[in-house]
C-alpha cells in the first residue's frame, strides 16, 4: 500500500490553511446548513471574507481520510425530500476500468486500490418511479431547496466588511460596473436563486449521489465561475495524482472540476475523485464509452453509451458533456476549415456518423438521455463538438449551426426540467467574441454559457493560459457564466501540478476581471481592500488578499528578503530614499492642511494663468498638412 | 576587467538565432537601406517571414563588440540632410553618475568601465542654428525620409508568403478585423508613413545621436508595439546586467526599451545601452535630475532639469517621458483617492509644486523643452503622472484633467513639429477602458497613445503581467499604439531576466491579439500558418512559429520526449489510439468523396427529420414560471 501513503503526504501540502486565514461558517436556516467562507485577518485588525472553494481540506479542525471520502453536506436534504430511493445499482464491470487497455493494465493493483478504499464504493440512489429530482423541477414548483439557500448565502458572503468600500458614493458611481444585460441584485436571496434556476438562467450541479458537494450556482447573475480539467490519459498519470490534482485545483479556486480520464482505472479513479470532492464534478461520458469499445468510434452504440451514463450517474457525476449537437448534416461544413474538428467528443461523434451514414444517436436519443438525467439530477453541459480550433475557423456555419441545435435541445431538456448549460469556444479573435455571446443568448434562451477560453490568438503555444485569459475575461464580462481554464501546456502536453495552478490563477484573474466589470460588489471590494493595503504599505495584507499569497511573498522576498522590509514604508522599486506612495501621503496631508476651499481657489487662479499662457502661443494651431 | 567577460558570456546566450530562422534583409531604394526580417523555414518547404526587433544580435554573420557599439544604420541619412553639426557637447560630470549615492559608489570601477569602452562615448550632433531636425518637420514639408521608407518596408514585411492565407475569400470576410476607427492600408507606402507622421498620428522615435536605431513607428495605423522597462535602482543591479537585459528584451520582441535607472553609474549605463541598442530608448529624465539633487524633490530646478535633457539628448535617447501635465491645481484632486499618486515622476513633481506652492516648471517651461527636443529629434512621451494606482481611482477627475492638459501640450509640441505620444494608465477595470481611449482621441488629436497595461484588477500580485495583458489587448484593439509591459514582479520587486521575458511574451500576446482584432493582415496570417502546422502535425513548425519556440518545445518534450513523437500523427493529450485531428482528416476525405452536393441533399433530408422530431415533442414549450 505504498501509493496511498505517497498520496497522503502529497495531500498534507495542500491542507495548509492560507496565510492569516481561517475557515468560517455562515449559518443558514437549519443546523446542517452552514456555508464556508475564508476569513482573512488583516494586520490593521480588519477582516476580509472571501468566497471559498477549497472545501474541508483547508479547515484544520476537520479530519480527512481520503479512503473514506468527505462527509455528506447534503445527505439529510436529499433523504428528507422523500422522492429518492436506494437501490443496488449497476454492478462493477472489468470493462468500466478501460480494460481494452489490457496490455498496460495492472489488475492486481486495481484490486488492491479498491479493497483499500472500499468505503468509496457506495450504494446509489435514484428518483422514485415517476419522480423528477432536479433542482429545476423543485424551483419550478416554487420550492426553495436547502441547496438554493446555500447558494444565496455563498454568493453574498459576509457583506458587512464591504460596507467601507461601498460607502464612498462618488467612487461607487464612477466605477459602477456595466453588467452587459445581467441583473445582479445587491443581495442574493434564496428566492432569487430559485427563480434563476426555474427559468433556466442558472444551474446548481448537484447529483443526488454526490451529497459531498457544497452547492454552487452557474449563471450570469452570479459570480463568474471557473472549471479546471483533470484526468489521466492513455499515455501518463495515475489515480493518486488525479485526486491530489483535484484538491490542489480547488485550493486555488476551481469552482468545478471535470474528470477527463481516458486511460486505465477510470471507474475507480472517478470513485476517488467524487467521494473526495466538495465541488461539482463533470465528465464527458463518451470518452469512457469509447474506452469500452477499444477506441473504435464506429463500434459505439446507444446501449453502451446509456449504460455508461447510468454508471457515472450512480457514482455521483454532477454534469455530463453531451455532444448531441454534432449532427450528420453539419459534418461536411467542417471540411474546408483550417483545423477541422478539434473537439475530441465532436470528432468521435463525427466519425460515428460518417461510418454509419446515420444521424447521431445522442441527438436521436436525447429524450431518453433526459430521462436518466432527471432521475439523478445530472445537469447537461451541451458540448460544442464543432467549436473552432483556430481563429481562422471562428464563428463559421459549422459552429453556429451546432449552437442553434444546442438551443433546440435546451428546450427539450427544460421540458423535462433538466438543468442545462451550453459549451462554447475555443479559438475566437477578440473582435468576434461578442457575437458568440449574442448568438448564444439568442438561441439558447439565457441557459448558462460555459466557454473554453476563448483563445484570442494562435501563436502562443506555451502561454495559452494568457492568450485565452484575455478572451475569457471579455466573454465573462459579456455574460458567460463559467470559464473552462486553459493551462500553459494546452496544445503541447499534459498539465502537471504547477500547470494546473497557473491555469487556475489565470482564470481566477479572468473571472474576477469580469465580476469587477459587471459590477459585482464583492469583487470590487476585494480589489479595494488590497489597494488600500498596498497604499498603506501593509505588505503582508497585500500578499494575503491576493490570489496567490505564496508567490507574491516569494517575489517580494527575492529582492528584499529581510523581514523588516515588510513593514517598511518603501519597496524595492524606488528604494528607501524615494517612494511615490510616501510622497502621496504628504500630498494628502498638504491638501488636508490647506483645505479644499483654498485649493480650489488656487486652481481657479492657476487656470487663469494657464489661459494667459495658452493665449500667448498655445492656441496658435498650425495646420498639420505637409507644406508641399 | 572581469565584468565585461561575464557580460560577453551572458550575451552569447542571446545571440543564438531562433530555431529554423535566419535574418533576411529587404532592400530599399538605396544601398544602405535594408530592413531586417526573420525568415522561418518550415518543414514543408514554405517560409514565413516575421517582424524582427532583435537587431544584429541574431545575425550570425555580424560581429558584435559591445565595447564599440553597433554600426550606425542611419549615419549617412543624418549627415546627408546637412542640417546638423558635430559639437563638443556637454562635458561628463561626476554628478551625472548619481554621485549623491557616494556611500555605495565605486569611482575606481566606474573609471575602469569608461576606459574599457571609451568608443561608446561619442561626439554629439545637434541641429544647426535655426534648423528643426524632427521626422515630423520633414514630413510636414513633404519629405519622405529614409527612416519613413524603412518603416514602410518593415510594417509590410514580405507579403508574398501571406497570399495563401489571405486568398480564401469566405474566410477573409468572416474573420475580417474591426479596426475600431483605425485605417490600416493593405500595403503601407513610404508616403503613407510620411502622412501619418505629418499629422501627428504616428511617431518615429529616432534621435540624431542614435544612428544605431532601426527605425520603427508608433501609431494606431501600424502594428501595435510594446515597450519593456529596464534599469538599475538604488537597491540592486549593475551595468552589465542592464545591457544584457536590453539584448534579451529585444530578442523576445520588445519594440522599444525604457531605461529607468535611478542608481549609480546611470550616465555610463546609458552610453552602454544606447550604443548597443537597435531599438529606440526612452527615459524619464526627472529620475536622473532627482539623483543630481540627492533625491530631494524640492531642490529640483529648471536649470538642473534642462541640463539633464541636454545630457541625455546628446547620448541619443529617443524619447523623454515628461510629466508636464502634473499641474499644481490638479494635485488636491488626488487627496481622496484610494491610492493617491503612484507615478514616481508624478509624485516628484507634486512634491515640488507643494513645497514651492508654484506651478510645475515642466509646464511653464514647456516651449523651452520643445526647443531642445527639436534640436535632436527627441520625441515627447507626455507622462501621466496622475494615473490611477488602483481600479478604484480609474477615470477620475485628476486623471482626466491631466489628460486634457496633455492634449493642450500636444498642440504646443506640434507647433514646434516635435513628435509626441501620450502616456496612459495604469489600473482600469475592463468596462472603463474604452472611455480612456475615447477621451485620449478626443483631447489629444490622435497623437499615439502609450499605456501601461492597464491592469484590470488589483488582486493578482505576482501575476500582474496577466491581469494587465487583458487590459492591454483591449486598449490595443481600441487604438492604443504602444503597450508598456508589466512583469510578474510588478508591485513586488525588481524583474530579473525571466520576469522580463514573461512580461514581454504576455505583451506580445496582447499586441498580437489587438493586431488580429484590428485586421492586420500580417498578424492574421501568422496565426493561420501556425494553425495549419498544428493541424498537419508539423510539431517543429508549430514550435518555431510561436512566440517562444524554446518553451513550446520544452513543454512538449516533458510528456513525449522522444524525437519520433514530433513527427507522429498524435499528441500526448489523446494518445496514439485516438486523436481528434486524425479523425478530422477522415471527415475531410469523406466530404470530398461524397461530394458537397450529396452532403447538402442529405442535410435537407435530415433537417426534415429534425422538424418531424421536434413536432413530436420538441415544440411543446413549458412555461418556466414556478407552479406556485
UniProtKB/Swiss-Prot annotation, chains A, B:
The gene is thiC. This is Phosphomethylpyrimidine synthase. Its cofactor is [4Fe-4S] cluster. Substrate binds at residues 229, 258, 287, 323, 343-345, 384-387, 423, 450. Pfam families: ThiC-associated, ThiC_Rad_SAM. It comes from Variovorax paradoxus (strain S110). Homodimer. PANTHER family: PHOSPHOMETHYLPYRIMIDINE SYNTHASE, CHLOROPLASTIC, THIAMINE BIOSYNTHESIS PROTEIN THIC. Belongs to the ThiC family. Keywords: 4Fe-4S, Iron, Iron-sulfur, Lyase, Metal-binding, S-adenosyl-L-methionine, Thiamine biosynthesis, Zinc.
Amino acid at each position: 500500500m505504498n501509493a496511498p501513503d505517497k498520496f497522503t503526504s502529497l495531500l498534507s501540502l495542500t491542507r495548509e490553511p492560507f496565510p492569516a486565514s481561517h475557515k468560517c461558517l455562515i449559518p443558514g436556516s437549519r443546523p446542517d446548513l452552514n456555508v464556508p467562507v475564508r476569513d482573512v485577518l488583516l494586520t490593521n485588525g480588519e477582516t476580509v471574507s472571501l468566497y471559498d472553494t477549497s472545501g474541508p481540506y483547508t479547515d484544520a479542525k476537520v479530519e480527512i481520510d481520503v479512503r473514506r471520502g468527505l462527509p455528506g453536506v447534503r445527505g439529510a436534504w436529499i433523504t428528507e425530500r422523500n422522492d429518492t430511493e436506494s437501490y443496488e445499482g449497476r454492478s462493477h464491470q472489468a470493462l468500466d476500468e478501460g480494460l481494452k487497455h489490457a496490455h498496460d493494465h495492472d489488475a492486481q493493483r486495481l484490486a488492491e486500490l479498491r479493497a483499500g478504499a472500499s468505503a468509496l464504493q457506495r450504494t446509489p440512489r435514484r428518483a422514485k418511479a415517476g419522480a423528477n429530482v432536479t433542482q429545476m423541477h423543485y424551483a419550478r414548483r416554487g420550492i426553495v431547496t436547502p441547496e438554493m439557500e446555500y447558494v444565496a448565502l455563498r454568493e453574498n458572503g459576509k457583506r458587512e466588511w464591504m460596507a467601507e468600500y461601498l460607502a464612498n458614493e462618488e467612487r461607487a458611481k464612477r466605477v459602477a460596473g456595466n453588467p452587459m444585460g445581467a441583473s445582479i441584485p445587491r443581495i442574493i436571496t434564496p428566492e432569487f436563486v430559485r427563480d434563476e434556476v426555474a427559468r433556466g438562467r442558472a444551474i446548481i450541479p448537484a447529483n443526488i449521489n454526490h451529497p459531498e458537494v457544497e452547492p454552487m450556482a452557474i449563471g450570469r447573475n452570479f459570480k463568474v465561475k471557473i472549471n479546471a480539467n483533470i484526468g489521466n490519459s492513455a499515455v501518463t498519470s495515475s489515480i493518486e495524482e488525479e485526486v491530489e490534482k483535484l484538491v490542489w485545483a480547488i485550493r486555488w479556486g476551481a469552482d468545478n472540476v471535470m474528470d477527463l480520464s481516458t486511460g486505465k482505472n477510470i471507474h475507480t479513479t472517478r470513485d476517488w475523485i467524487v467521494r473526495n470532492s466538495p465541488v461539482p464534478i463533470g465528465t464527458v461520458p463518451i470518452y469512457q464509452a469509447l474506452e469500452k469499445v477499444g477506441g473504435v468510434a464506429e463500434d459505439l452504440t446507444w446501449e453502451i453509451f446509456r449504460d455508461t451514463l447510468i454508471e457515472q450517474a450512480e457514482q455521483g457525476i454532477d454534469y455530463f458533456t453531451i455532444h448531441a449537437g454534432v449532427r450528420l448534416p453539419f459534418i461536411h461544413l467542417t471540411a474546408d476549415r483550417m483545423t477541422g474538428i478539434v473537439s475530441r467528443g465532436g470528432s468521435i461523434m463525427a466519425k460515428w456518423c460518417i461510418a454509419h451514414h446515420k444521424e447521431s444517436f445522442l441527438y436521436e436519443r436525447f429524450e431518453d438521455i433526459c430521462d436518466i438525467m432527471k432521475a439523478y439530477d445530472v445537469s447537461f453541459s451541451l458540448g460544442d463538438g464543432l467549436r473552432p480550433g483556430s481563429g481562422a475557423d471562428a464563428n463559421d456555419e459549422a459552429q453556429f449551426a451546432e449552437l442553434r441545435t444546442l438551443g433546440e435541445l435546451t428546450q427539450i431538456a427544460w421540458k423535462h426540467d433538466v438543468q442545462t448549460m451550453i459549451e462554447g469556444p475555443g479559438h475566437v479573435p477578440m473582435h468576434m467574441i461578442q457575437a458568440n455571446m449574442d448568438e448564444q443568448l439568442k438561441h439558447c434562451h439565457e441557459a448558462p454559457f460555459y466557454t473554453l477560453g476563448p483563445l484570442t490568438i494562435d501563436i502562443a503555444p506555451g502561454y495559452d493560459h494568457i492568450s485565452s485569459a484575455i478572451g475569457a475575461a471579455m466573454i465573462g464580462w459579456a455574460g458567460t457564466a463559467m470559464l473552462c481554464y486553459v493551462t500553459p501546456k494546452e496544445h503541447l502536453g499534459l498539465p502537471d501540478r504547477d500547470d494546473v495552478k497557473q491555469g487556475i490563477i489565470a482564470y481566477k484573474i479572468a473571472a474576477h476581471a469580469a465580476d469587477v466589470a459587471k459590477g459585482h460588489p464583492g469583487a470590487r471590494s476585494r480589489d479595494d481592500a488590497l489597494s488600500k493595503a498596498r497604499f498603506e504599505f501593509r505588505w503582508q495584507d497585500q500578499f494575503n488578499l491576493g490570489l496567490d499569497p505564496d508567490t507574491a511573498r516569494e517575489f517580494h522576498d527575492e529582492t528584499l528578503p529581510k523581514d523588516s522590509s515588510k513593514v517598511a514604508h518603501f519597496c524595492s522599486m524606488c528604494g528607501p530614499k524615494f517612494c511615490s506612495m510616501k510622497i502621496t501621503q504628504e500630498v494628502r496631508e498638504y491638501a488636508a492642511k490647506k483645505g479644499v476651499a483654498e485649493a480650489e481657489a488656487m486652481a481657479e487662479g492657476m487656470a487663469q494663468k494657464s489661459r494667459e499662457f495658452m493665449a500667448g502661443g498655445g492656441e496658435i494651431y498650425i495646420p498639420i498638412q505637409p507644406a508641399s
